[in-house]
A protein has these predicted regions:
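N-terminal G-site of the GST-like fold
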Residues: 1-120
């Protein structure tokens, strides 16, 4: 049996943006916004920023069920965040969810508005 060398992490890790396939750009190892772009805001206090992914659908179903039950405070505006185009890295979205993941909810019924992100938290 031969001994293998122990792994030693690099002192400086460099991210190679070019590595990866079509969906490699939906995640990145750096924090913060990659570009300036404000998020749209509709007429309801709850603003949902999401996409039709399983986690995004969970929140939409929840809000639709609450609205169907007559809970007026659950009325919301939904906005598409196209993760394939990197919209989750916009300055507006990162202000709501610093993790740059969908879904994210912004509740304007409080001052300042309350940020809620990750489907389980919403």
């Amino acid at each position: 049996m031969s001994e293998t060398a122990a792994y030693a992490p690099a002192k400086v890790w460099t991210w190679n943006k070019e590595v990866g396939g079509k969906f490699a750009a939906i995640n990145r190892p750096t924090a913060g916004a990659s570009h300036e772009q404000a998020l749209p805001v509709g007429k309801h206090p709850l603003q949902l920023y999401s996409l039709g992914t399983p986690n995004g659908v969970k929140v939409t179903v929840l809000l639709e069920e609450l609205v169907e039950l007559g809970i007026i405070d659950a009325e919301y505006d939904a906005w598409l965040i196209n993760i394939q185009d990197g919209e989750q890295f916009s300055s507006g979205f990162v202000e709501v969810n610093p993790n740059s993941k969908i879904p994210a909810l912004l509740d304007h019924s409080t001052t300042p508005p309350t940020r809620v992100f990750e489907s389980g938290a919403i």
